[in-house]
């Protein structure tokens, strides 16, 4: 009898423990499920703050040159508004736009200059901003979701692709924020690329994108380019575009 009761208690305890563990566990989504939810989250982003570092190392005739770029700021969609800072080597550029009306530009320590926001200017800035670039990738990611691995890291999921499929060169190009003409990439072949997109478990919103890639020049394989991109995203749908402190808007500016 004691044995039977002891066995029964053990079975009941095991059942309750199994239920408790099942209730506490979270199933890791497949890469397709994660990317579907991630791309849906992208569609709902109306404002955000971002910080992007780009490092390019070119090797030409065994000589290596390194270039560093940084672009950071806050952007709001519809109507387009932004406060963006760009640094390329020793050149600093600041851009401010509010309600798609006028664009203000400041280079290094010079004074702000006002430019009328033509439809062409708006189209150019709209296509080059981070939210537009992210949304450009939606169909591509959904179509190629099975190429990615997904793993849990704390409060996040990390989607990873590593390979050399040439179609990922387009993803690399669209991950450059704030850069206009990218036709120079047509002269290069993709040798390898690793993409790591970190997203929140709770909302599937972007946290950080890391890309490392190597390209070779089509007409001379000894010419190589190593590119590293790291972009973090925060303040999603909380970001507000504030007028720069040193910009005094008057009738003449």
Predicted regions and their residues:
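Sec-dependent bacterial lipoprotein signal peptides
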Residues: 1-22
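Extended lipid/amphipathic-ligand handling interfaces
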Residues: 37-42, 70-77, 97-103, 194-202, ...
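Short, hydrophobic/aromatic-rich segments at coil-to-beta transitions
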Residues: 47-51, 77-84, 153-160, 205-210
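Hydrophobic lipid-interacting interfaces of membrane-associated proteins
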Residues: 53-61, 87-91, 108-110, 214-218
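An acidic-aromatic
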Residues: 72-131
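Flexible, processing/modification-adjacent segments and terminal tails
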Residues: 108-176
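Gly/Pro-enriched, hydrophobic low-complexity segments
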Residues: 157-249
